[in-house]
Curated annotation (Swiss-Prot):
This is UPF0597 protein CBO1815/CLC_1757. HAMAP family: UPF0597. GO terms for molecular function: L-cysteine desulfhydrase activity. Coiled coil: none annotated. Pfam families: SDH_alpha (PF03313).
Length: 426
């Protein structure tokens, strides 16, 4: 495959995001809908797919102590700046939060069960009429903007039912045409300058981690760091990862570099690699190459599991990605990278997702632990053999199988998780 296609996919899948991306997506959609209509707000209606609704259900809104779909929509409408994309709530003020709390009776939320992929629709009614926005497939992919039933903007083909994926999604799907040996060959041989941009994720996510070490969220990252000695890069990796996620899910006003639409995925696919790089005094080039591998494996799996799913994509998809990156950084061969992925597939695949919340850092820690264990096993010639569980004869089928566990495998599980969350909130 043309290396420029791979590089473009990596660039496209990377994006700064403030807070968890699902409430940010709701806020962005609402901000854009209000932007085109303006006026005194009378009603806001949000229609979201079950996965997006679940992930935003109990997640903190950046810069506030508020959580959930309703507050994300209200704040997006009241103070969101759509030009900032997934950082649209960057300019939030205390008075905006106070105003939003007085308007909770003006919002309606509907779950759109019969939809494929990510979906959020915002309908904002004011004294000037109705503004409507639809986001599809990617968290910031606005495909329709209407003002009083007049189309102001529409992405060609994106609302056509026969076209299940946007052009952006089709591009990323090309990753699944690659064999693992082709992926590793790209990682080894691509000109460093062409992938140096991947280090931007390290800078951004490290700042978020430092914020989390102040004790935000459940304080797991801070707790782990306190028991970490100077040379233990595994515990250091867990601490960096968990503290960044602690900060993110608790609403810290610091962006993460997302990948495949998720800040947590972006954190897990990068910070454990930074931990190894720092503790072993490695150079930036080998770090960038390991990130490229981590990202590509994560993207590969996510193309089969979907952007949002019943399993914890952070621990499973991103965890598998970073396990390959860890093996690479520790000097692993192609065969050892393959065996690392087999070990991960046999370990935590199937861990459920209960949305973006304070428990995310706990699941992330499990994913990072499993990633290091899988790599160490492979580097010591320990591997789960083919035809054992979901491990297939080809590593590409094994990665596909990881995704298949989520979709279609766990679709009923996802529904039941959402039902439990809604019941528990009453």
């Amino acid at each position: 495959m043309d290396e420029n296609i791979i590089i473009n996919i990596l660039r496209k899948e990377m994006m700064p995001g403030l807070g968890v991306t699902e409430p940010a997506s709701i806020a962005l959609s609402s901000a854009k809908a209000y932007e085109v209509i303006g006026g005194e707000i009378k009603n806001i209606k949000i229609i979201a797919d079950p996965g997006l609704f679940k992930n935003a259900f109990s997640c903190a809104i950046p810069g506030t102590k508020e959580v959930g779909n309703e507050m994300a929509a209200l704040l997006g409408t009241i103070c969101g700046d759509a030009s900032l994309g997934l950082e649209c709530l960057r300019k939030i003020k205390k008075e905006d939060v106070s105003k939003a709390k007085t308007m909770l009776d003006k919002i309606d939320i509907e779950i759109k069960s019969q939809t494929e992929g990510l979906y959020v629709e915002s309908i904002v009614t004011t004294n000037n009429g109705i503004g409507r926005t639809i986001i599809r497939y990617k968290h910031d992919n606005i495909v329709l903007v209407e003002k009083n039933n007049k189309i102001l903007y529409q992405k060609e083909n994106n609302l056509n039912k026969s076209n299940n994926f946007s052009q952006e999604a089709i591009d990323s799907k090309k990753i699944t045409e690659m064999k693992l040996d082709e992926i590793v060959e790209f990682v080894n041989n691509v000109n460093y300058e062409k992938i140096e941009f991947l280090l931007e994720s390290i800078k951004m996510n490290k700042k978020l981690s430092e914020k989390g070490l102040e004790g935000l969220g459940i304080g797991l990252g801070k707790l782990i760091l306190e028991s970490c000695n100077e040379n233990n890069y595994e515990l250091y990796a867990e601490a960096l990862t968990c503290s960044a996620i602690d900060a993110r899910v608790s609403g810290a006003p610091v962006p993460a570099m997302t990948v495949t639409g998720s800040g947590n995925h972006g954190i897990i696919t990068t910070l454990p690699l930074l931990a190894i790089k720092e503790k072993k005094n490695l150079n930036n080039e080998v770090l960038a190459r390991s990130i490229a591998l981590s990202y590509i494996i994560n993207i590969y799996i996510k193309e089969f599991s979907g952007k949002l799913s019943a399993f914890c994509g952070c621990a499973v998809a991103a965890g598998t990605g970073v396990s390959a990156g860890i093996c690479y950084l520790l000097g692993g061969s192609l065969k050892e990278i393959e065996n690392t992925i087999k070990n991960m597939a046999s370990n935590i695949t199937g861990m459920i997702c209960t949305g973006g919340n304070l428990a995310c850092s706990l699941k992330a820690n499990t994913g990072v632990k499993a990633a290091f264990l899988s790599a160490k096993m492979a580097l010591n010639n320990i591997v789960i053999p083919n035809k054992c569980g979901i491990v297939s004869n080809s590593i590409e089928d094994t990665m596909k199988n990881i995704g298949r566990i989520a979709y279609p495998g766990m679709m009923e599980t996802d529904k039941e998780i959402l039902n439990i969350m809604i019941e528990s909130s009453k």
